[in-house]
Structure formats: C-alpha cells, structure tokens
C-alpha cells in the first residue's frame, strides 16, 4: 500500500529563483548608483516629463560552471573580505583582453541595458536621501481645507454624508410615536408598510478645519553671465531641475521662485529659468539681493521655511566681492539654509567658493564644488541631506 506524506507545511530551504532575483536587483541598484552622475548631468533631462526614459548598462549574471584553470603556480587564497560571487585569482594573471595593450583573446563580460524613467529615478533618490526637516511655524497662505471629525447630525446634507443608522432610528422613533398615538385614541394599530419620509433623513455634520502644512519656499538663483558657457549653464539647469522635481514629489505645499542675473537680477518664470540664456558681466550680489527683497515682500521668515540655492562658476567682478559676501551673510540670517554650488570653476583664479568659506561662518551656509559632471550627484546629496538646526 502506497503511503503519501504531506510535506506542504515544510518550507524549501533555498529558492534559486529568489536568489537570482535578489542578485539582479542588487546589480540594477548598483548600476543606477554608478550612473546617477551621468544621468543627472544629461542636457536632455531638463524639461522632460516623468515618463522620460534613460538607459543604464548592467552586467549580466552568469550561471555557475566549472572552467579550466590557467595552470599557474600557487593556490588561490582570499583575504577574508570576499563576498559571495567574488572571483579569487591564483598566481600571476596576464592581461588577456581587459583593456590593456594589444588585442585580447578572452571572452568579455556581457552587458545589457535597462531603462529607468525620470519618475523612477526620483523614487530612487527619495529612498536614498532625506530632505532638511521643514519646521512647523505659523501658517499663512498655503493652507488646505480638510474634512475634520464628524460633529453631530443635521437634517439636510449631501447624499454621501447620509447617516444610515441614525436615519433608520429616526424612522423607528416616528413609527413608535404613531403607534402610541393610535393606542391612546383607542384605535387599532395594524402593521403595514411604513416608508421613509424626508423628515427621517439624517446627515453627518462635518466641521471644516484648516489643515496645517509646512510652508516652504525654494529660491533658485542662477548666474547667467558670459563666463557661464553652455556646458556650465546646462549643468546648473540640470542641478536645479532635479532639485525642483524631487522637492515637488516629496512635498505638496512648496513654493518655488526663480531668479537669474548678470549685473542685474530678474525674477523669471520656471520655463524662462530653464530655457532662456543671457550674456554680460557678473555681480553675484545682484542675484542674492533680489532674493532678499523677494523674501521681504512675500515670505516672512517667521512663517516660512526658506531655502535659497545659488549656482555660479565662481567668477565675479572684483569690485562686487565685498558686497557679495555681505549679502550672503544677510540672507543666511533670514533663511533656514543657503546653498552655494560652484560649477566647473576656473583653475587660474581664486573663485568665490574660497572667499565665501573664508569669510562666512554661519552654520546654515552650505557650499559644494562641481568640478566635473560626475560630481553633480554628490553635490545634490550634500545639499539635500543637510539637516538644519535653528537657534
């Protein structure tokens, strides 16, 4: 007689498919991280929709197999820091096609491309970073109404707020009142259909309460002078564009202001900021002073979390240097954070990055240097991960 044993309650110790999926996910995440700088600095990223796709190269995962050795002397030993899947080489290893001199005869690594959308890229950044804490202050213009708790009942209202249980109770109460009245009059009470009436309907009374949200404004300031060539401007726009997209995704109630300047600063629309170009001299102070005036007019520091961010190549008219330093000190006093990003700075002269860091000691002054495109990701991380502590 055959005996069947039930083993359904026992879990499989190892699922190869799950392990492969895990390794594949690790490779994808590693490739995204390694290529973030290139993706974020792409000129085409500016102004793209959330469904815009970017291609990322990923090395394939090979199946385990036995291979012939190179017949070299010695035994393969590790250092103790190896991870699962790492290769341990033994003896001397000759260059046979790994990018060294001459043509090689070894099989290369298989590489394929995967696509990631701009929206998915923002999601990845969200998982990696945390924004500065938006402190709760008094709330001014950005206040959203929300349906608060139910506060009692009323006889009139909209159908979605119909209180069914209370309506049935009102009907039963009316029915019982009629029954008592008939009995008191000495009349026979016969059970018959007793329909609902308008007077039975009860609706939830909902009190509208203001929903407090963290008021935050990001002020983007960009140097649009002649020394900012097309490469620097594209890099600055990519920097601001990713920053704005990430912040819009992270917070619902956040305002944006855009300022660009040469020797004179102008407040512009978001589209103009990311697409318009100018030329001329450079007064860094003009852009910062315009931001200070904007804060005085629209964003009281007692009610708003204020985050100005400035991007420039660091070249400034020498007569404006002192005024620029003083204006940065002033805007730091009324802001939660002031970020200064210097793009592809000149190696022949001392830029404003060094002057600012020498003269400005405010804790909420954050400065970064982007010497090449791959530095963009590190600059964004530094700016976004900075937590501010107010006195």
Swiss-Prot record:
InterPro entries tied to this protein: Spore_YhbH, UPF0229, vWFA_dom_sf
Record Pfam families: DUF444
List the biased-composition ranges (Basic and acidic residues). Answer: 80-92
List the residue ranges of the region (Disordered).
Answer: 1-23, 75-107
Tell me the domain of life: Bacteria
Name the family: Belongs to the UPF0229 family.
PANTHER family xref list: UPF0229 PROTEIN YEAH
NCBIfam families the UniProt entry points to = spore_yhbH
**Protein name according to UniProt:** UPF0229 protein CLH_2838
């Amino acid at each position: 007689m055959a005996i069947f044993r039930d083993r359904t309650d026992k879990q499989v110790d190892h699922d190869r498919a799950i392990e492969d999926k895990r390794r594949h996910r690790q490779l994808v995440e590693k490739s995204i991280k390694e290529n973030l700088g290139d993706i974020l600095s792409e000129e085409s990223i500016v102004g793209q929709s959330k469904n815009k796709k970017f291609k990322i190269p990923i090395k394939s995962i090979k199946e385990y197999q036995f291979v012939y050795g190179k017949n070299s002397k010695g035994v393969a030993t590790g250092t103790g820091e190896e991870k699962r899947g790492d290769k341990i080489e033994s003896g001397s290893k000759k260059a046979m096609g790994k990018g060294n001199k001459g043509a090689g005869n070894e099989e290369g690594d298989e590489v394929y491309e995967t696509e990631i959308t701009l929206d998915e890229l923002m999601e990845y950044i969200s998982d990696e970073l945390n924004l500065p804490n938006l402190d709760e202050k008094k709330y001014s213009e950005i206040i959203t109404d929300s349906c608060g708790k139910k506060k009692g009942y009323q006889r009139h209202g909209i159908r979605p707020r119909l209180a069914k249980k209370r309506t049935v109770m009102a009907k039963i109460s009316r029915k019982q009142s009629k029954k008592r009245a008939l009995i008191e009059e000495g009349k026979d009470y016969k059970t018959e259909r007793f329909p609902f009436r308008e007077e039975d309907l009860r609706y939830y009374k909902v009190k509208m309460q203001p929903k407090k949200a963290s008021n935050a404004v990001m002020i983007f300031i960009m140097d649009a002078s002649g020394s900012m060539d097309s490469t620097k401007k594209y890099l600055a726009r990519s920097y601001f564009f990713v920053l704005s997209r990430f912040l819009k995704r992270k917070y619902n109630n956040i305002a944006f202001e855009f300022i660009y300047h040469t020797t004179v600063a102008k407040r512009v629309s978001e589209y103009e900021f990311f697409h318009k170009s100018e030329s001329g001299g450079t007064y860094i102070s003009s852009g910062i002073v315009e931001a200070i005036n904007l804060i005085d007019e629209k964003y009281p520091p007692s009610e708003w979390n204020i985050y100005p961010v400035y991007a420039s190549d660091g070249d400034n008219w020498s007569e404006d240097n002192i005024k620029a330093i003083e204006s940065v000190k002033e805007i730091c006093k009324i802001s939660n954070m002031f970020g200064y990003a210097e793009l592809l700075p000149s190696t022949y002269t001392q830029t404003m990055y060094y002057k600012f860091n020498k003269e400005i000691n405010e804790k909420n002054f954050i400065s970064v240097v982007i010497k090449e495109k791959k530095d963009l990701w590190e600059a964004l991380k530094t700016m976004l991960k900075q937590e501010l502590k107010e006195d």
